[in-house]
Amino acid sequence: MNQEVMNLFNPQAPAQTFDSIRISIASPEKILSWSYGEIKKPETINYRTFKPERDGLFCARIFGPIKDYECLCGKYKRMKYKGIICEKCGVEVTLSRVRRERMGHIELAAPVAHIWFLKSLPSRIGTLLDMTLKDIERVLYFENYIVTEPGLTSLKEHQLLSEEEYMIAVDEFGEDQFTALIGAEAIYELLASMELEKIAADLRVDLAETTSDLKQKKLMKRLKIVENFLESGNRPEWMIMKIVPVIPPDLRPLVPLDGGRFATSDLNDLYRRVINRNNRLKRLIELRAPGIIIRNEKRMLQEAVDALFDNGRRGRVITGANKRPLKSLSDMLKGKQGRFRQNLLGKRVDYSGRSVIVTGPELKLHQCGLPKKMALELFKPFIYARLDAKGYSSTVKQAKKLVEKERPEVWDILDEVIREHPVLLNRAPTLHRLGIQAFEPTLIEGKAIQLHPLVCTAFNADFDGDQMAVHVPLSLEAQLEARVLMMSTNNILHPANGAPIIVPSQDMVLGLYYLSIVAEKEPGEGMIFADMGELQHALENKVVTLHTKIKSRFKTVDAEGNPVSKIYDTTPGRMIMGELLPKNVNVPFDICNQEMTKKNISKMIDHVYRHCGQKETVIFCDRIMQLGFAHACRAGISFGKDDMVIPESKAKIVAETEALTTEYEQQYNDGLITQGEKYNKVVDAWGKATDKITEEMMARLKAVEFDPVTGRQKQMNSVYMMSHSGARGSVNQMRQLGGMRGLMAKPSGEIIETPIISNFKEGLTVNEYFNSTHGARKGLADTALKTANSGYLTRRLVDVAQDAIISEVDCGAEIGLTMQPIVDAGQIVASIGQRVLGRTALDPILHPVTGEVIVEAGRMIEEKDVEIIEKAGIQSIRIRSALTCETRDGVCAKCYGRDLARGTPVNQGEAVGVIAAQSIGEPGTQLTMRTFHLGGTAQVVDSSYLEASYEGTVKLRNRNVVRNSDGNLVVMGRNMAVLILDATGKERAVHRVTYGSRLFVDEGDTVKRGQRIAEWDPYTRPIMTEVEGYVEFEDLVDGLSVSETADESTGITKRVVIDWRSTPRGSDLKPAMVIKDKAGKILKLSKGGDARFLLSVESILSVEPGAHVKAGDVIARLPMESAKTKDITGGLPRVAELFEARRPKDHAIIAEIDGTVRFGRDYKNKRRIIIEPNDDTIEPVEYLIPKGKPFHLQDGDVIEKGEYILDGNPAPHDILAIKGVEALASYLVNEIQEVYRLQGVLINDKHIEVIVRQMLQKVEITESGDTGYIPGDHVDRIELEEINERLIEEGKKPGSGNPVLLGITKASLQTPSFISAASFQETTRVLTEAAVAGKMDTLQGLKENVIVGRLIPAGTGGMTNQIRRIATARDELIIDERRKTSGSAEANAMLVDMTNNAAE
């Protein structure tokens, strides 16, 4: 009862709890049941009285009163008449809020088709009737009749008749012998008369009988829709509407503007058109107007309803008075401005403010400075409450006055209110979760928010005018979450890679670096100090400087916590820093007794965090920040133009390179090299020159100089200090200031041959300046475009991964991934330790020598284990992965491993999918914003040699080499590798060497680190002979397949293979070179094939017919693409391409089986390759390869499954089909990582794995068994496994399927939740599909729950849901028990009441 009294003034319906939402097609009865009355007039409101017109679009009688508890004519006012219907104006006396809820309807005089089911492809009506969309439209828009009942005539059912044909048929057969209808009535009749069960049975029979793929697809599509209708209980004829619902008037408001005009929602215009046409049609029917006029009116009615539902989907767009298209109901839902994304997924919130940020170096890490004015406004309700409680005011009005006058007691109360009440700070764009963090406010004067310098990295903030928003968490729960989970002190590590993100940068780094410098010959060198006190004394009296080499005792503690001390060689500066280290046995002085570059500082903070915990780390960070600032200020480091040193040898290096380029120019003129080769060599030469000048410059800057008078060391070069410490600037930028700017790129990505020889200190010539504007402009244009692209990528990633949540502790999976170190060009880019840290071991990890267990199976690999693993030199470890996790909804904690942002095993309910998406998307934006910082300077990425990365013994895997006529060893194998073994015979490095490389070592040789192993020409790919003999040409016909091209500038000719398929005469040619012996017999190769070498287009012939060649000699060469600059520009689209699982343009062709290569008959302009399997039970596989693609296999080559037949980027689908899930995972992870690694961005593999897991959720049914699926259906992998288990138990036939890889957009749209899919993309299509199938959304993921306004099932929300579930289950158990024991109804009733109350 007391609830009623409480809610007297604002009665609200109790919120209904629900577990799922269903969408289906509304039947006419349903629409009528929603409606409160029919709308008969198109009028809206009376322009004089501003009162709604009766029976109009805003009618108060239908939709409810305009003012609370007041009828329209004013006869009944106030609460006491609640629920009475006024007899004069017919308005119910109730809240005006019902105008947001009550719907009306329009009775249509003729049925119309619902445009969504008609035009949304595939057209549901069309598929169901098995007619084309064109035909249906002809009927609907009154062009053709359709036969619904042929009777005994020769007409067929569904036959279309034009007006004339219809008349002829009527004359011929008589009007009552058959029925043919026109318009939506016809379609309605056809749909209503469908017997779905019978059609479904017929389709199944047809499916079983048909053999053609196309027909099967068509039948399957139709069967699916028929089954959807059967299962959902929707009727097909409901897709034709006889009644149109009208949405509540407050959702399509009409607002009077000053000056007697009105602003109205577009929907009112659209509804008005429908009502006008409908009323006109009714009148015409009453008047018995001629058929043609009625038909025209019906067609116009259909168009009006179409425009109301989806304007512009069919015909021309209906525009308003200002030529702007009207927003239809579909447009209200669609896109960024639609209902889903604008109002449901993101809302504007109150209790927020924004202001400019300034730095607050005296704040603690958990604090922020909040301007008093802002705090007063934000915390108003709290202040009012406190003023009331303390008796300063008795009403809100008084409190308001006090606050407005800013009385002194208000400020005291504000202090109390703010104490311990965290606020959230957010900087847009919020690219990852660290873009919103909680701080404790401290009140400050002024109008700018103060931000702690150490959190700037996380927010990506700087103080050049950035603004930030402040939000106040109101409820106790929100304050608790802000404090416990979002406080800046809890976000020390980066969620993407687990490294500290609270790291000093810029000035702080410079200060700490300056503090840690050691200088020679400083005063007091070699002195010994007992403790910090003495040292401080000496410093103050200038006996020593910060950089003097000294010995000093450093005090720390041992494992029991007793003080111990040890003497170190160090400097006073480093001792000052050492004093700040937490006293802990695991934190030795050594970690700050070194040059404090940014990397080392980061390592130091990481070390302190791992060993001393969060609290100590936060205090330590604050202290080193203050120390850094203090000493950066004291040191006074700055630089002038003379600090940019131009190396003396610059002129000499430039002159030498210019001489080289002249020489290449000459070689080109003499015809020794091609234009392309010349270009590559010139670019190469200038690249090397730039590097050389840079090296010289850096050497000059690094050099230590001594003052001849005092003998003391001069201060280091300031610019070098800034760059080397990692505070600001890079070698690249210094090179442009003091070396030479180097090569520039054109906007197309090619490199301009003439470099910029000057640097910024000397100044550029006009030509150089012009050349360099190219790259700079491209950078600026790219930035603008790519920010959007990167944001879109993040959005797709979040959408596909949003429901990957940690939902259980251990799924018990017995499969996983194999981790190996990543080696790139012989360098280890990611060690095995880095890759397995924080992952769960799948099998026990054993020491390779002693065999002892380092990590047991199922335990997480920690830092200490990694050290042992790296020392033991283990090369391959099996770990658990999210990709192979067997949890039904979400991922299990064991498969995921460590929560990188906390450094502990991941908690249940953590939204790992969203974290993964943010970790991958955030650097994308960063990188795209940073392209132009290089000023468009080109970096050539091409290697042409291989150096040993370790000492050891050489072993050649798949050895296949010959000595050529120059006496060099040449690699003849396609898949040969050079292995370097250490003393114990373990592989330390594996280098792939390409076909045609020159080898400098052979099996069993020992190599030193850095020794050259092999080299090759990166710009051409050679074709070499394996046997000695005489060359003969086959099918190399002048003018057809070979042309002598003379270079315009030199007149030298070279013979090049041209595209022989372009002429009809050349279509059967197979240009090749054969090697014969003296007798003219074709020689055999080692593998048994003939020594015939097929040539592809653009090959340059290197020998003449009849020439004598030795094994390993080059007989032709194929030029490669010239060097393009690598830049994340290639990177971001590449990442998107991989995640979208698109087939690359010229994708590689991969062998599906092991076998021998044979050449088959060529087909048009394709070359046919057949692989004959080694195993006779398998069929041979054929591939068609476009002629003229560089192709390196020869007849008779042995090929293994998974090897490339044609080079290029492989299509991920092929890898999945041929090599399986694990190979696909490692390919995608490595490719994506490579893009980010190039930019120096660290992302943990597990994030990419989580996304790939979401892409691999579905299987395509191949054998349906008794599952009830149709072959070709995409089904959830785990769902299929569950169904199969059930079928096997029942003794039925299980189904089977192959895993399919879906791109992230496709995977997002295929989620089981239609709400989530609709809010992502293609809203109309998703909703149409869901409505036909009567889909149920069980609200499992995050987005669905945000949209319906519930706590998300992750984090604290996940726990709340879990507790609720447990409670409900427990209640049900108790009720059941009671029912069994006491049969008395009263006891039951009482108990039910009790549980209901408890639930409420």
Curated annotation (Swiss-Prot):
Cofactor detail note: Binds 1 Mg(2+) ion per subunit. Binds 2 Zn(2+) ions per subunit.
Residue positions binding Mg(2+): 462, 464, 466
Keywords: DNA-directed RNA polymerase, Magnesium, Metal-binding, Nucleotidyltransferase, Transcription, Transferase, Zinc
EC nos: 2.7.7.6
Catalytic activities: RNA(n) + a ribonucleoside 5'-triphosphate = RNA(n+1) + diphosphate
Binding annotation for Zn(2+) 2: 811, 885, 892, 895
Gene3D superfamilies: 1.10.132.30, 1.10.150.390, 1.10.1790.20, 1.10.40.90, 2.40.40.20, 2.40.50.100, RNA polymerase II, clamp domain, RNA polymerase Rpb1, domain 3
SMART domains: RPOLA_N
Chain positions recorded as Zn(2+) 1 binding sites: 71, 73, 86, 89
Cofactors (names): Mg(2+); Zn(2+)
One function term, GO molecular function aspect: DNA binding
Pfam family, any one: RNA_pol_Rpb1_5
GO biological process: DNA-templated transcription
Presence of keyword Amino-acid biosynthesis: no
Gene Ontology cellular component annotations, sorted alphabetically: DNA-directed RNA polymerase complex
Assembly mode: The RNAP catalytic core consists of 2 alpha, 1 beta, 1 beta' and 1 omega subunit. When a sigma factor is associated with the core the holoenzyme is formed, which can initiate transcription.
Family per record: Belongs to the RNA polymerase beta' chain family.
Function recorded in the entry: DNA-dependent RNA polymerase catalyzes the transcription of DNA into RNA using the four ribonucleoside triphosphates as substrates.
Family annotation (HAMAP family): RNApol_bact_RpoC
Protein name: DNA-directed RNA polymerase subunit beta'
